[in-house]
Design a protein with these regions (language model features):
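Intrinsically disordered, low-complexity linker/assembly segments
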Residues: 40-183
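Post-J-domain flank of DnaJ/Hsp40 co-chaperones
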Residues: 1-35, 66, 180-183
Length: 183
């Protein structure tokens, strides 16, 4: 049983990234100070799909107080900031989409913005109930180790359309009366 190899102390820093950075990966600049007071700058490649709280270790960029010992490591703790429209669930993303109840009844296609800023045409089937969650395969986060990509889950929120003209209200009332007379 050999003695453990001694080395200089590790240094830990925290980097805050966005959910978009998780989706696509990002190079960031990490700035930190060693015990000696030396200011260090490191170019850090944050991998795609990294988890909140995960620590990335970079060997040999830590403390160097004792020159006779190997340099310590740099431990980079990742904090993923909350996103206004998307929530992460492992490899999956979750979002909400407000659709008026007439479109839910009749069916429609709605353009929704993806995490990357693109547009996705989301098919709303006829008779969809508010609160239904639609799954869009392949629009989640990709795990770089496995190549697996999660889904985008869209929760449909029903909203009442703005009926400010008397004619519109009368048409909806007539439809309501007709549907109620059938049941």
């Amino acid at each position: 049983q050999g003695r453990p190899i001694r080395q200089n102390a590790d240094v830990t820093i925290t980097i805050r990234i966005s959910l978009e950075d998780v989706m696509f990966g990002k190079n960031v600049i990490g700035r930190y100070t060693l015990r000696s007071g030396e200011e260090c700058v490191a170019n850090l490649a944050i991998p795609q799909g990294i988890e909140n709280g995960q620590v990335v270790q970079i060997r040999g960029l830590g403390d160097n107080t004792h020159p006779q010992l190997p340099r310590g490591n740099l431990n980079v703790q990742i904090i993923v900031l909350a996103h206004a429209d998307f929530e992460r669930d492992r490899l999956h993303l979750r979002t909400k989409c407000s659709i008026n109840v007439l479109e839910l009844m009749l069916g429609d296609t709605k353009n929704i913005t993806t995490l990357g800023g693109g547009t996705l045409a989301l098919k709303i089937p006829k008779g969809l109930n508010p609160g239904t969650i639609l799954s869009v395969p392949g629009y989640g986060i990709t795990d770089v180790r496995t190549g697996q990509t999660g889904n985008l889950y869209v929760e449909v929120k029903g909203i009442t359309p703005d009926l400010d003209r008397y004619e519109d209200i009368a048409k909806v009332q007539a439809l309501y009366d007709e549907l109620n007379s059938r049941s």
